[in-house]
A protein has these predicted regions:
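Short, non-transmembrane cytosolic segments of multipass membrane proteins
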Residues: 1-34
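Surface loops and adjacent helix of pleckstrin homology
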Residues: 27, 47-50, 98, 121
Length: 200
């Protein structure tokens, strides 16, 4: 079973691949939640997604401005003690560091229920998450082909065609694979066949 483990700022994300689903465990400060996502629910579209708290960045800049203003004020008034401006500069730096370490850079993978699966791009490094996502999509495609890219003359034409269209729409099969299966379906199952086991 392939696994990916990611930890950042007390948050742990564990991903495990089985033969027909993805197990995802999210834990933070001892609170844990595990869900399983069937391969049928993974659309597979992957986009880059960054998360940052711009309010924290704005507040840091504001405190830096206060520190600079106090520094200039002390110089203009002939004062030598810059401890107050230095204090605010240190506070601003701490806030900026907090902002920096809480920025997240994810791969966002679309699910069928308008939810998304988030995987850190660079934890533990850039290559491992990429390889895991490739394995996820490869296993998903293999499973979906085995279970939905089949032709059964006892099943109705339209539902089987819908399966092939769905597989093509999520990238589980190529356009060429779809066209080949479509021609095979037309040759095997009567398009007008509506009842299982009976043709007209």
């Amino acid at each position: 079973m392939e696994e990916l483990r990611q930890t950042k700022n007390f948050t742990k994300r564990d991903y495990r691949l089985s033969e027909n689903k993805l197990f995802y465990n999210h834990s933070k400060f001892g609170n844990s939640n595990e869900i399983d996502i069937p391969f049928e629910n993974i659309e597979g579209e992957k986009v880059s997604h960054k998360i940052s708290n711009n309010n924290t960045l704005f507040f840091s800049v504001l405190v830096y401005i206060v520190a600079i203003a106090l520094f200039i004020s002390k110089i203009n008034n002939g004062g030598d003690d810059q401890s107050v401006s230095l204090f605010w500069a240190v506070i601003a730096t701490i806030i900026l560091a907090f902002y920096w370490f809480n920025r997240d850079d994810f791969w966002k993978i679309k699910l069928t229920d308008n939810n998304y699966l988030y995987i850190h791009k660079n934890i533990p490094n850039k290559e491992i998450p990429e390889n895991f996502i490739n394995s996820l999509i490869s296993k998903r495609n293999e499973y979906l082909k085995e279970n939905y890219l089949i032709i059964d003359e006892n099943l109705d034409y339209q539902s089987q065609l819908s399966n092939f269209k769905w597989l093509k729409s999520i990238g589980a099969i190529s356009k060429i694979e779809f066209e080949e299966k479509y021609l095979e379906l037309k040759a095997t199952v009567n398009p007008r066949k509506t009842d299982i086991g009976f043709g007209k």
